[in-house]
Amino acid sequence: MKLADLSSPAFLENPYPLYETLRRQGPFVSIGPNALMTGRYSIVDGLLHNRNMGKSYMESIRVRYGDDALDMPLFQGFNRMFLMLNPPVHTHLRGLVMQAFTGRESESMRPLAIDTAHRLIDDFEQKSSVDLVTEFSFPLPMRIICRMMDVDISDAISLSVAVSNLAKVFDPAPMSPDELVHASAAYEELAHYFTRLIELRRAQHGTDLISMLLRAEEEGQKLTHDEIVSNVILLLLGGYETTSNMIGNALIALHRHPKQLARLKSDLSLMPQAVLECLRYDGSVQFTIRAAMDDVSIEGDVVPRGTIVFLMLGAANRDPAQFTDPDHLEITRKQGRLQSFGAGVHHCLGYRLALVELECALTVLLERLPHLRLANLDTLSWNQRGNLRGVNALIADLH
């Protein structure tokens, strides 16, 4: 398997046959100078938990775009996001942001998620068919994160466009010049929007997510203005498109396994298990990247210091060495720990909120529209992103 495969039409349509080949080729596959890829569960899990495997974001930018790109506001902004940093700076920033994403805070969002799902369905349930991407799975997480930030819902459309233009930053292949221009403009638009909002919140002392970050302290230190701007943008990115794609991918997986869907409809108490299994089966985030900060030994192999490793989460979730019959969706599967949210110090901070949103979205949809049928199940158009896997449209017949 080669790095170029991650943007090939075959991979975008269905990455799992390529993952099977990757696992068969060995514990690691070389994909370039000082670059490796792995899809085996035990190695992915081991490296995610290894503290000598860290982030090397600006070096990856230098390699892909050259030295001049290091001063671009887009990449400087991303480099302030705690997702891109290593301890101890990562620990400090994550600790501050984490206060808004505890289990208690995430669970408190359940009534809002349920109400949002009902309101969205109210708007389209009388139609004969609907695109669930534009009418349900995309607006649901955006409305919730906007409520958490106390952002005017009328701004959600422009914010979602900007976020979508930023999403290409997470792909392994370099952006084209046009894509780089659009991503830079999107970052500047979001930075300007949230700078204005942050200044308003400083005087209001509210209870929203942005106000919580302004007040958050750990060991007497607060976030700087630029850190708040970058990490609010990160939370918007993480709380929107990844979750919306999860909803769509879960619906596709369930409808491609009608017996499992029927079982879930007959007993919605299985929803928490079903959501986890759908995430294992076809998650939205397909891989993450780590850099060896020192020589790292694992299962008889050595990852040399300075090596970049592509950890294929989607491949690990289908590894038969970890999961029995991994290519089959089984909503009552006795879970081994799935890799959809990563692991270790960079484990997804918002995973609890994502699970709440998924459980509520699917439960309300199945309760309100029990006869819903996906009309384009055999002609799906998958987006052109190597990492954030999802479909461009999901047409459903409602009655």
Swiss-Prot record:
Superkingdom assignment: Bacteria
Residue spans crossing the bilayer: none
Gene3D superfamilies recorded: Cytochrome P450
Family matches, as PROSITE patterns: CYTOCHROME_P450
Residue sites binding heme per the record: 348
EC number: 1.14.-.-
Name of the top EC class for this enzyme: oxidoreductase
GO molecular function, one term: oxidoreductase activity, acting on paired donors, with incorporation or reduction of molecular oxygen
Family stated for the protein in its record: Belongs to the cytochrome P450 family.
Protein name: Putative cytochrome P450 133B2
Species lineage: Bacteria, Pseudomonadati, Pseudomonadota, Gammaproteobacteria, Lysobacterales
Gene name of this polypeptide: cyp133B2
